[in-house]
Amino acid sequence: MRYTVALTGGIGSGKSTVADAFADLGITVIDADIIARQMVEPGQPALNAIAEHFGSELIAADGTLRRRALRERIFSHPEEKAWLNALLHPLIQQETQQQFQQATSPYVLWVVPLLVENRLYQKANRVLVVDVMPETQLIRTMQRDDVTREHVEHILAAQATREARLAVADDVIDNNGAPDAIASDVARLHASYLKLASQFVSQEKP
C-alpha cells in the first residue's frame, strides 16, 4: 500500500482548494466525493437503481441526478439514507481501491469528508485537517451552494465536531485567512510527506 495522507475538514472548510494545491505538486489525489458523484452519472447502474427506488422525479430532463432533491429526501429518513449508503459504499470502495493501485506519486492524498464519522483515519498513515471557524463554514457554504443558514446548520450538526476532527489530526492547515496562505502550507507539508513516504518505503522493503 502506498503511503497515504488522509485529508478531511467540515463542509466549506476548503478541502478542494488544498487538494488542488497538492495535485499541482504532482501528487495523486483520490477524492471520495468525486468518486461518489461519478457513481451516479447517467448510464451508471447506481443511477438506475436510485430512479427505481425513489422515483423518476429525482432524474432531471437531461438524465442527471437531482442531487438536492435526493439530499432532501434522505435527510429526515434514516432508512432511505441507509439504503443509499448500502448501494453506493461498495461501489465507492471498489473504485477507490482501483485508484490507489493506479497511483504513481510517492504518496497519495485521500480526500474523505466523513473521515472521522466513519473512522477511516485508521486506514491512513497520516491525517491532515483543514480547519476553519464554524461561522466561516456557514458563510462560505451559503454563498457557494446558495442555501439558507438553517440548511447549513443542519449539515454541520450532522457532521463530526471541529474538536473531534482536530483530535485525530497529525497536521492542520488553518484556512480562516486568505487563500494565498494555503500554497506555502502545502509546500511545507509536501516536503515533510515526501520524507515520510520515503522512510515508509524503506521500512517496507524486506
Swiss-Prot record:
Its main location: cytoplasm. NCBIfam families: dephospho-CoA kinase. This is Dephospho-CoA kinase. Pfam families: CoaE. InterPro entries: Depp_CoAkinase, P-loop_NTPase. It catalyses: 3'-dephospho-CoA + ATP = ADP + CoA + H(+). Pathway: Cofactor biosynthesis; coenzyme A biosynthesis; CoA from (R)-pantothenate: step 5/5. Its EC number is 2.7.1.24. GO terms for cellular component: cytoplasm. ATP binds at G12, S13, G14, K15, S16, T17. Belongs to the CoaE family. Residues 4-200 form the DPCK domain. Catalyzes the phosphorylation of the 3'-hydroxyl group of dephosphocoenzyme A to form coenzyme A. Keywords: ATP-binding, Coenzyme A biosynthesis, Cytoplasm, Kinase, Nucleotide-binding, Transferase.
